[in-house]
Amino acid sequence: MSAADLTAPAAVPPLEQQGDAKLRSQVRSAVIWRSGTQVFSQLVAWGSTFMVIRILSPADYGLFAMTSVVLVLFGLLNGYGFANAAIAQRDGGKDQLRQLFGLLIVVNVGLTVLQILLAPLVAAYYRQPIIADLLRVQALIYLTNPFQALGYAVLSRAMDFRRQAQVNVVSALLSAATALGCALSGLGVWTLVAAPFVMFASRALGTITAARAWMWPSFNFRGARALAGYGGTIMAGQIFWFMQTQADIIVAGRTFAPHELGFYTTALFLSQIVLNLRIGREGDLVERRHHFGHEDLG
């Protein structure tokens, strides 16, 4: 070996290789955090559900199933497709995020008002007056969506799935504690309203705080056509999934008594519990990787 070889500087990997290695490390970390915490969160949710099932009556679950049809439908229209579009266009900057925030507020305030107006009609369809009161209170959940979706978009742009996962764990624990506390307090079907609201509200506050995404919304939607088009396409495709999965509740809810529907939905939940165990959402990670301009996970 010559003296020149001894004094030569070590080879430095090209910047492209360094960036690719860093991104692979981010993806591995994200898979671990999302998979592990999602399994933990679902185990917490299932544990509280099994305890609450022993306390509430089948009629409580039947009434909740009737309202869930509306919640599932409007949940597909809550604007998360717009957030995914903003993640894909990560060079949009803060102005695009402010537009996204404004668009989410408009959509979810509209859903809130619409659900309140439709509540008496849904109650009349199911012949259960209490359904109207349940839907009016459940409509408040939509007001948490703009904050949660904005924080989700900011953190996903940064490939920061660790803080998202931590927020999800905390919100799952709070929701489980709320469900058990309300059930033991004798709140009946309102237990199934309070627990999801606590989960969504805590997740919204935690996500937007973790993302440090506090900003004023923009209601000037000029140039937001790409966001609206992408999000609208996603929502339209999900409508078919809604029709496939909720048709039985729509029909059975009008035909069966609440306690009979409660037996049906609880049995359906228990029979599908293993299938519903989703270990992470690696599809999200692959999509983020793709938008960073790479083709394979290495």
Regions found by a protein language model. Name each.
Residues 21, 25, 53-67, 89-100, ...:
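Membrane-interface helix-capping segments at transmembrane helix termini in multi-pass transporters
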Residues 14, 25-45, 67, 72, ...:
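Membrane-water interface segments that mark the loop-to-transmembrane alpha-helix transition
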Residues 77-94, 156-157, 267, 271-298:
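Helix-loop junctions and terminal segments of transmembrane helices
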Residues 132-139, 167-213, 226-232, 260-271:
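Hydrophobic alpha-helical transmembrane segments
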Residues 50, 59-78, 140-141, 248-250, ...:
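Alpha-helical transmembrane segments of polytopic membrane transporters and translocases
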Residues 2-23, 27, 162, 205-245, ...:
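Interhelical loop/hinge segments that connect adjacent transmembrane helices in multipass membrane
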Residues 27, 85-94, 144-168, 190, ...:
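Membrane-interface junctions at transmembrane-helix termini in multi-pass inner-membrane proteins
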Residues 30-38, 68, 104, 137-138, ...:
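Residue-level signature of transmembrane alpha-helical cores of multipass secondary-active transporters
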